[in-house]
């Protein structure tokens, strides 16, 4: 009797092990098919286009031993999403840099879901804005850090690469296609300057023109203090359109980020305040008649008061709790 029980127990154990083995083999086959299909798509196009069915099969459904970075966007012309197109260009640069690097493996894939091709995915994730970047790890659900902070970090390929490295430990060296516009513009500028110097070679007094140098220095200072360098490094969007109200925001609500339009606004305000100060100085020191000096003084005061008030209001909107204001809140 004891021998019969042992034989029965052994049979059950063998059947269970066989079942587990078959299940494991099936799981490995499914995983192998998924990875093989993704590798095939990635070899043809570094950014894999996905609809709802592909998203559920290759990203939401187990098994998975790879990460997938997905850009949720709206690239169709009737959506009028300028930021989506700009972000897509940077995303393509990042994906191409990974695809054609010597370190390319099946650890990570890059995909895109367009709203017009996968609106059900947007509904599944309760997503109501685009573009949005999310990293789907090999195991578990995406955490808070797996959603890219676009408004803070911008969509430059280099910033996306740092975020990918932080979330997946995959380091991507971004390689941009050659851009000859910069060197051509620099060469044209040098040619124009060289031509002017050659034509005026008999009289180079214009190089000592204080007004010209002052204007050049002023333009440089206004550009730098308005945040142009930050834009160059981070690549932020020009503005943000609320998908619910269609209201366009030109000023970012956080002190940690800005829009390109915001830079232009601040540059205009700073320039107007500077012009007002120049007019006040000229009104006090010039030899013009009293009437013209009064007009210059009034214009200078008006420019300083109005545009400095607007500048402070912009500052207050970004740094919540800032106690000071002037005329405008």
Curated annotation (Swiss-Prot):
Cytoplasmic side: 200-212, 280-294
GO biological process: protein N-linked glycosylation via asparagine
Recorded superkingdom: Eukaryota
Positions of glycan attachment: 65
Membrane topology recorded in Swiss-Prot or TrEMBL: Multi-pass membrane protein
Disulphide connectivity of cysteines: 81-84
Extracellular side: 24-178, 234-258, 316-329
InterPro entries: OligosaccharylTrfase_OST3/OST6, Thioredoxin-like_sf
Segment forming the signal sequence: 1-23
Subcellular locations according to the entry: Cell membrane; Endoplasmic reticulum; Endoplasmic reticulum membrane
Keywords: Cell membrane, Disulfide bond, Endoplasmic reticulum, Glycoprotein, Magnesium, Membrane, Signal, Transmembrane, Transmembrane helix, Transport
Principal subcellular localisation of the protein: membrane
KW Repressor (keyword) present: no
Gene Ontology cellular-component terms listed: oligosaccharyltransferase complex; plasma membrane
Positions of transmembrane segments: 179-199, 213-233, 259-279, 295-315
Pathway: Protein modification; protein glycosylation
Span of domain Thioredoxin: 41-169
Assembly, per entry: Accessory component of the STT3B-containing form of the oligosaccharyltransferase (OST) complex.
Function: Accessory component of the STT3B-containing form of the N-oligosaccharyl transferase (OST) complex which catalyzes the transfer of a high mannose oligosaccharide from a lipid-linked oligosaccharide donor to an asparagine residue within an Asn-X-Ser/Thr consensus motif in nascent polypeptide chains. May be involved in substrate-specific N-glycosylation involving acceptor sites that are near cysteine residues. Could indirectly play a role in Mg(2+) transport in epithelial cells.
The protein's name: Dolichyl-diphosphooligosaccharide--protein glycosyltransferase subunit MAGT1
Originating organism: Xenopus laevis
Gene transcribed to yield this protein: magt1
